[in-house]
Amino acid sequence: MLKQVGDGVWVRQSGWVWSNSTVVRTDDGLVLVDPGISGAELGALADEVDRLGVPVVAGFSTHPHFDHLLWHSRFGDVPRYATAGCARVATEGREQAQVMAVETAEDVPVELVALVSPLPAGGGPVPGEIIEHDGHAVGHAAVLLADHGVLLVGDMLSDVLIPMLDVGRPGQLDAYEAALGRLEEAVRRVDVVVPGHGAVAERAEVAARLTADRAYLEALRRREEPVDVRMEQDWMMGPHQRNLQALLD
């Protein structure tokens, strides 16, 4: 079910890794950010979007991981955007993203996965300010909707996921820490932060998430075992081990 988190901003959470789809109302229509995950959930999101009575005019993907590159035909044949870096990686890795989507979620419209284009100068129909960084993935974007009091941060600042480095690329600790610094500045301009996975946070709650993420990264840098409540989930050990391996490669 869509939950309003700001003026003209709604979030729907998936049962898969607490993934958040965001709907933003603009003067021209609705923009969907990272809609997902299963075919049934995408269809339910389409039902709720229909009830808003406003047409979808665009989509936006915050980064080039499969669960942020999904779409449904009922949203319409409208432009779907990403940063130039994200669009390039998504296009090059489209086949792999399709495979991962099929293996992970039921009835995903595979033919619509990863069909994103570089965002035009000025943002086109996508509202707000795009904050691009290289933490977590190439061309990762946060969307600062200052007029709505909301910041969409993609796969950052989660209460359920540890920081996940972009394995295979050098300098990821520095890149992730720099990204956190930029997001910290943006948080001061909003009331609500929407992560790609996990609970929507009020501004006062975000400081604890920033502290937790920085403590985790510092433990990695020191080659120490992090003390992080998020790692009490057994399945978080896989991402943690990949982070460790990334620092050794």
Task: Report the location of each language-model feature.
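Short amphipathic alpha-helical segments
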Residues: A46, W71-R74, G93-E95, L165, ...
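Generic beta-sheet signal
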Residues: Y81-T83, V153-G154
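Conserved beta-strand hairpin/beta-sheet module of binuclear metal-dependent hydrolase folds
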Residues: M1-D47, R51, A142-G154
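Accessory terminal helices/loops
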Residues: E184-V192, A199-D249
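Active-site metal-binding motif and surrounding structural segment of the metallo-beta-lactamase
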Residues: A40-A82
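Short, active-site-adjacent cap segments at secondary-structure transitions
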Residues: D67-H68, R88, V200-E202
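Metallo-beta-lactamase
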Residues: Q4, L30-V31, I37-G39, R51, R88-D134, V138-R209, ...
